[in-house]
Regions:
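Conserved, mostly hydrophobic/aromatic
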Residues: 169
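Histidine-centered catalytic/metal-binding microenvironments
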Residues: 126, 130, 156-162
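N-terminal accessory beta-strand-rich subdomains and adjacent acidic, glycine-rich linkers
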Residues: 1-151
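Aromatic- and acidic-residue-enriched segments that line the glycan-binding/catalytic groove
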Residues: 174-190
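Conserved small/polar residues in nucleotide/adenosyl-binding loops
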Residues: 218-225
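Short amphipathic alpha-helices and their capping/turn segments at secondary-structure boundaries
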Residues: 150-160, 212-217
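Aromatic- and glycine-enriched glycan-recognition loops and surfaces
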Residues: 195-217
């Protein structure tokens, strides 16, 4: 695993409100000779090993174990003091990476629905029963507890949503302008004139072309999604 990726995940878990110095107190190593460098050490589970990563063997096995009541994808719930370092075998680094990257969609490439999408009911969060839980946020709180347990002062996590970005997928911006749409129009007995008008006419006459209305709705004083 590249140091840049590791640093990003640790920083992501710790949170932007936490000083950078605290990130350096967290180690991701199985080498006991390096434990003394850190306040908290997370033991790698082997998920990122070259022979395992990207293969079906890297996928979590059900049922999942738990660490302090939180579903754990990789590692074990074992926690212990090794001299002055709090060492945990719960690999929340790999678990977080798996969840935020949608890693399983890469490994299970052949599993897609009729639209080419990964089926939600095949996802690990659904099959493991934690689809309704913000597991990565719970990992963050857990990591903060570990840091405090190692006698570090960690700011409280601010419970707020900073920004929400609304997106809208438009699968078919027009109904009749494609060749399939033209055939559909003729099949629906709209007549040849209207069918060809739908194919080659102005966009404003296509019933699916509602972007001006949508933009007006979105920029109104009380925008609503529909």
């Amino acid at each position: 695993m590249k140091n840049r990726t590791l640093h990003y995940i640790i920083r992501f878990l710790v949170g932007d409100d936490v000083p950078s110095e605290l990130v350096e107190t967290i180690g991701y190593t199985a080498d006991p000779n390096k434990f003394d460098r850190y306040n908290v050490v997370i033991i790698p589970s082997g998920f990122f090993d070259g022979q395992t990563y990207g293969t079906p063997a890297s996928l979590p096995e059900l049922p999942l174990q738990e660490v302090q009541g939180i579903p754990l994808l990789f590692g074990s719930p074992k926690e212990e003091w090794v001299r002055d370092t709090w060492v945990v075998h719960a690999d929340i680094i790999a678990s977080t990476y798996f969840l935020i990257s949608r890693y399983e969609e890469m490994v299970r490439r052949g599993l897609r629905d009729e639209h080419g999408r990964f089926p939600g009911k095949e996802s690990l969060p659904y099959r493991a029963g934690f689809l309704h839980r913000p597991i990565v946020d719970e990992y963050r709180m857990l990591l903060h507890r570990w840091l405090r347990q190692s006698r570090l002062r960690v700011p409280e996590v601010k419970k707020q949503i900073r920004k929400i970005y609304l997106t809208h997928d438009v699968d078919s911006p027009t109904l009749y302008r494609s060749w399939k749409g033209l055939i559909r129009s003729i099949r629906d007995r709209r007549g040849l004139y209207k069918s060809f008008q739908g194919k080659f006419g102005t966009l404003e006459k296509d019933p699916f072309y509602t972007f001006p209305w949508f933009c007006l709705l979105y920029t109104s004083p009380s925008p609503r999604d529909s």
